[in-house]
Amino acid sequence: MSILTLGPAGTYSHRVSLSFSDDIVFRNSVTAIVKDVSDGTFDKGIIPVENSIEGSVTESLSSLVDHDIAILEEVVAPIQHALLAQSATFDTITSHPQALAQCRNFITSNYPDLKLEPATSTASGIDRATEDDSIAAIGHPESSNEQLKILAKNIQDQSSNSTRFFVIAPPTKRQKLGEKTSVIIYPKSDYSGLLLKILQTFADQDINLTRIESRPSGNKLGDYLFHIDFEASSDESRTLEVFSNLHTIVSENGWVRSLGSYNVTHLS
C-alpha cells in the first residue's frame, strides 16, 4: 500500500514512513497530504504533529481541522540534527522552520550573523546545500553525500529531541480501540468557565489528558478551537459519556469531532 508523506526523499517523515512501506509517494506540504488522504485519493499518510522542543506543528493542526481524517497510529521518533555543507565557508543556513528552531542555541552560539532561510522540508534544504556551496543545511546526518560533509552532529538544543507523527487514513477507517483517542472541539462561543466545563467532563470520568491545545478558528480574533488527546478508547463507556457531555457544552453552531483511537509506537 502506498503511503503519502512529506518530501522530497530524505525528510524525517520519509524515514518514519519507511518503517511501514517501501512504496512512498511525496507531497510538498502537510496540507496536501491530509487533503489527499481525507478525500480517499490515498488510503494512508504520515504527518508530523508535535516536537518535544518546539511544540505542535501548526500546519498539521490546521489541516486536521479543515479536512476530516482518521488517526490509525501515533509514532514517536528520535530526531537528531546535523549541520551539512560543501565546506566550512558559507553565508546561509537552510532547513525546515521546525529544524531551525530546534537548533536555535547551536546557531546562535556558532553562526549568530548568518542568514537563516526556511525550506519546505529538511530534505529540500539538503538539496539546496548540495546545489549551492554558499548554503549549509540542517538535516539528518545520513543525508551527507559526495558534495555535502557533516560539519557538526547532534546540534539540536535537547539530546532527547523527538517528534510525534500521526499515521492517518480516510474518516471511514476510524478505530474504536487503542491506547489514546484524539478529539477536536469547536465551541463557537466564549463565556466564563467554558474551558473548565470541557476539562471537568474528562476529570469526572477519570480520563487523563496527554495534550490540550487551543488554536485560532480563523473566523475571527479571539475565536478558538481545542485539540485534545486522552488516554482511553472511543468505545469505553466513560469516553461515550464524555462525548455526550461535550456535545451538550458546545453551542448549536459548534461541533465535536473524534479522530478515532490508536496505539503508540516508539522508534529507536
Model features per residue range: what roles?
Residues 1-268:
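Domain-level signature for soluble enzymes in the chorismate/prephenate branch of the shikimate pathway
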